[in-house]
Amino acid sequence: MEKIFKLKEHGTDVRTEVTAGLTTFFAMSYILFVNPAMLAQTGMPAQGVFLATIIGAVAGTLMMAFYANLPYAQAPGMGLNAFFTYTVVFSLGYTWQEALAMVFLCGVISLIITVTKVRKMIIESIPTALKSAISAGIGVFLAYVGIKNAGFLKFSINPHTYTVAGKGADMAKASITASSSATPGLVAFNNPTVIVGLIGLAIAIFFIVKGIRGGVLLSILVTTIIAIFAGVVDLGSIDWHAASLTSSIKDLGKIFGAALGSKGLGLLFADVSRLPGVFMAILAFSLTDIFDTIGTLIGTGEKVGIIASTGDNNESKALDRALYSDLVGTSIGAIAGTSNVTTYVESAAGIGAGGRTGLTALVVAVLFAISSFFSPVVSIVPNAATAPILIIVGVMMLSNLKSVDWEDLSEAIPAFFTSIFMGFSYSITYGIAAGFLTYTLVKIIKGQAKDVHLVMWILDILFILNFISMAVF
């Protein structure tokens, strides 16, 4: 292990890395169930998507482990699978095979961007204050995800102010989009699941503040045990034979390679009238994939040594390898039959637990692979156990805001929009877009447009085009 992952050089050991890997896996294992449920709405077989999710996650995460030697895990991105289902398939009318073809092309575009060093140029073009804001923004995003997953929030929606997209009258497969009338509020703490989440948060705070070794994982385990005794997790309801590996493999055969088949790439460019929509969808896929990854790497890169505290690149070779690993996951995932694979922001939970090398990623990859045989085991760990970890890690990441000069509005305004919009829009990419656009706007107002890097001007234009496509198509 020492020879492969250079543990001593990174100030870590096997026990810490394994603990970090377990922490990251349980923080993101929800994707094993959420992704198949979401993509199945397009007509894809859920059990096949379950295996495709694992294949994409394992491929990308193993690349992170052995090629990049970094503690990042990959899996199909949540925002990306929602865009795949509700926008590309439901709203734009493409088939799931064509949507998979778009995802594959997104991987190819990412390869070109990475090989030509464009991704590295993007990172280097971002001002130090914005990098700090991106780090803090990911903290806001993580904390919000944790608070929501713990069940601490409720949302009230006024009648006739929302739209429903989904499969006919089946509300279980519907997506509800509300206007600004949707108002968040605090739940009444009288639900066992919410109470367990609150207890889990207290346990996590205790272990982490006390500096107990392996406290993050211990918090997850203790809270899970409490959830079982509280009836939040019903072991008796778990059907260990419901989804056998044999039936999953059979369903995988229906979607594996569909992206490159006659109903995928073969049809995608057949109708010239649809080309504008195709190109804009691919652009949206690519922008989101690129900036979800870049945002995560910038947000956590200082701790693992790929982004220096000055905001400049410290080990560009490791950073490049992380970016290559990401695109490999997307390409293989698309061929297997899932939406874009991206570097997971939940990796921050494992990094917070001490993960510093690819051994953390290897543990995550192995656990994903094992999940193909024992998927019910993964479902035992409730959101109430993992959500508190996301909240605490988010709090710790907010410390990056101290690097922002709040007296200088040219720094403060973009930093505010970057960090806050990540949580409010539930998207790392949209937070970055808000920061980039407001940064450029402030510079123009101050007569300092020449200080804006050329790459940022290009990205501003691409973000604006993406927002226009969202409004038009």
Model-identified regions with their sequence ranges:
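Loop-to-helix transition at the N-terminal end of transmembrane alpha-helices
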Residues: 43-62
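Membrane-embedded alpha-helical modules
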Residues: 92-222, 229, 360-473
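Residue-level signature of catalytic and energy-coupling elements of molecular machines
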Residues: 18, 38, 122, 214, ...
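Membrane-helix interface/capping residues of multi-pass secondary transporters
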Residues: 46-47, 72, 96, 428
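Helix-loop-helix junctions within the multi-pass membrane cores of secondary transporters/permeases
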Residues: 2-35, 56, 77-86, 90-138, ...
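Transmembrane alpha-helix interface/packing and boundary motifs in multi-pass membrane proteins
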Residues: 60-73, 205-211, 284-292, 326-336, ...
